[in-house]
Amino acid sequence: RRWGLPIPVFYCKDCGKPICTDETIKAVSDLFAEKGSNAWFDMDAADILPKGFTCPHCGKNAGFTKEEDTLDGWFDSGSTHFASMKKDQGFWPATMYLEGLDQYRGWFQSSLLTAVGAFGQGAPFKECVTHGWTVDGEGKAMHKSLGNGVDPADVFNENGADILRLWAASADYHADVRCSKEIFKQLSQNYLKFRNTCKFMLDNLVDFDPEKLTKPEDMPVLDRWLLTKLNELIEKAEQSYCDYEFHIITHAVNDFCVNTLSSFYLDIVKDRLYCEGAESATRRSAQTALYLTLHTLSKLFAPILAFTCDEIWLAMPHTGDDDARNVVLNEMNKPFTAYALDSETMARWEHIIAVRTVVNGALEEARA
């Protein structure tokens, strides 16, 4: 027999014409529902067709044969939208189809053709997203003979699942995606920077009550500067998620942790956190800024670093509005507009940061 989805067509032994009517299709459909498509190859045409069936062309009942050819495999995959979404669940059309670059004339096209042909309702997907191929660190295709493949299980065992997720999200998948131990090593460093930055914030929120946030008017301008930068990150991440530009999010979060937090804000605010009175207004203000930042980062990065962000979420303090069971059970934070500084004030801070960078560079040079 030929392997594949059978073509439900019969032929009249008398006139030789093909037969495919509503009546024959229903008979085949009922048979498949009961016994599966293999029944087509196991049963004779007379056992499939209704009793007393006659040829719609010549009107005779001289016997019938079945079509032995099968449908192209793309018809199978192109029909999955009906079986998986439209028939039972009612989720048709899909939010997104995701596949490799070669599927424009493959799965995407066959799905479109079957949907339009069967229902006349347009594409079975709202959007389709394509990606390049996974290659080694030098851009070469992976082959066992070359020994340049990377086993995901090895990445799990050496670095954890979040590192593999970070690799997938960090790459611009519109082009070929490089994969090597060196790349995972660099990503592990980025991951540790994110984790250690969040750990620092967690350590300094041990005695903080998130129900008692410092009001914007009582907050030092430096803390409001941080939250304004956080607002920018929220807006960029939200747009990037909507556009499926995950690499923009990973790079933006890394830049925020390295430059905005570690190299600037946290370096300055340590004195307030460590040296001022536990209940001092300026210390509580810094804790408010840290809490809102950590609260946002754990949600914002959870789709990528799922396990790490949930670990952070379980360890941090919460308000009654949070679902403390798991970070993904909560909605993403919106920008904290009440704390935002105006553009003129932010521009002045950019000048301050630029001067600080020059001075720090001169100090490092003098120490050398």
Please identify what each model-predicted range represents.
Residues 1-208, 226-269, 273, 288-301:
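Structured secondary-structure scaffolds
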Residues 10-13, 64, 208-235, 267-368:
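Acidic, turn-prone loop/beta-hairpin segments
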